């Protein structure tokens, strides 16, 4: 018996919608990352993008436990000498409400071209409205 290898053209991708309101950031991100990779499918192949499309709504209402709302820091380099910029979770949600969800999920995906292709199937929106009604996404309860 030969080992099954999924072919990119034969992968069936579904659309799912996740309501992030009141969900814990890391637990939700781990489940979404696994679905973006396609690990929930029996035909999962590590070197092929087998995952589904995921639409996350209400990202601004995500929950974090403990003191992470004020203590969790996000860093980025501006490209200028000595300019490492840092901001905490609360400030980042105030200015760019989708970023904490995107950063958490991106950190759980593989690095390289395959991981970037998987991340393109993630759509995150701050509010309850999204432009993907035509794809008829199924509700995903995490």
Curated annotation (Swiss-Prot):
GO CC terms in record: cytosolic large ribosomal subunit
Species per Swiss-Prot/TrEMBL record: Hydrogenovibrio crunogenus (strain DSM 25203 / XCL-2) (Thiomicrospira crunogena)
Keyword S-adenosyl-L-methionine: no
Source domain of life: Bacteria
Assigned keywords, A-Z: Ribonucleoprotein, Ribosomal protein
Single biological process term from Gene Ontology: translation
Gene Ontology MF annotations: mRNA binding; structural constituent of ribosome
Protein name: Large ribosomal subunit protein uL13
Subunit structure: Part of the 50S ribosomal subunit.
């Amino acid at each position: 018996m030969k080992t099954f290898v999924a072919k990119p053209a034969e992968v069936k991708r579904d659309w799912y919608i996740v309501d992030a309101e009141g969900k814990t950031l890391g637990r939700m991100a781990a489940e979404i990352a696994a679905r973006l990779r396609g690990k929930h499918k029996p035909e999962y192949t590590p070197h092929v993008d087998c995952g589904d499309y995921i639409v996350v709504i209400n990202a601004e209402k995500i929950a974090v436990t403990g003191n992470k709302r004020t203590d969790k820091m996000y860093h980025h380099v501006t490209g200028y000498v000595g300019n490492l910029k840092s901001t905490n979770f609360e400030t980042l949600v105030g200015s760019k409400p989708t970023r904490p969800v995107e950063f958490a999920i991106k950190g759980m995906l593989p690095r390289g071209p395959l991981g970037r292709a998987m991340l393109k199937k993630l759509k995150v929106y701050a509010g309850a409205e999204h432009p993907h009604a035509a794809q008829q996404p199924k509700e995903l309860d995490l």
